[in-house]
Design a protein with these regions (language model features):
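Residues immediately within or flanking Cys/His clusters that coordinate Zn2+
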Residues: 2-4, 61
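Short cysteine-rich clusters marking metal-coordination/redox-active sites
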Residues: 7-10, 64-67
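Short Cys/His-rich "knuckle" micro-motifs
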Residues: 14-21, 74-78
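Short cysteine/histidine-rich metal-coordination sites, predominantly Zn2+-binding motifs
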Residues: 22-32, 79-91
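Short, structured motif recognition centered on aromatic/hydrophobic residues
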Residues: 31-40, 92-100
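Short, intrinsically disordered, charge-biased short linear motifs at domain edges
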Residues: 45-56
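Preference for intrinsically disordered or flexible, low-complexity segments
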Residues: 65, 88-138
Length: 138
């Protein structure tokens, strides 16, 4: 079984061939389009149509292209959440920054960080590197 990526709401498959496909838009802007993300954790290459340019430093709203649900986390500001199922059938929450150019990814199973990558981790470690009972105060 190959690694799969799913919408956190409808559980529809987001990985097509070699990319994770999401819809992206900017708040208060008509600019929107599809973005193809590399599914390898730690690889931050993206592809968009030439008419839809992602601007570094700006925050985007990410939606499932199937059910159109917003994938940006309501719990962790500036992070986006999707689900990953590995080749053994284990399920993980994948969090990545919704701010273009920020490079950080968290792979979490239950309350345990299984993997974290990227030079911008220090911005978001506050959400994950504290005891569970204290997270409610964030």
């Amino acid at each position: 079984m190959a690694v799969e990526y799913l919408c956190k709401v409808c559980r529809g498959h987001l990985k097509v061939k070699t990319s994770i496909v999401l819809a992206a838009s900017k708040t208060n802007s008509p600019s929107r389009g599809l973005i193809f993300l590399n599914p390898k954790i730690g690889n931050y290459t993206t592809t968009t149509h030439p008419s839809f340019q992602i601007k570094e430093g700006e925050e985007y709203i990410y939606n499932c292209p199937i059910c159109h649900s917003q994938l940006n986390s309501t719990k962790y500001k500036h992070l986006v959440r999707i689900i990953m199922i590995d080749d053994l059938g284990k399920e993980y929450n994948i969090y990545f920054s919704g701010i273009a150019g920020e490079k950080c990814t968290y792979k979490i199973r239950g309350n345990k960080i299984e993997e974290k990558r990227g030079p911008d981790l220090n911005v978001y470690n506050k959400y994950f590197d504290i005891p569970e009972e204290d997270r409610k105060y964030l």
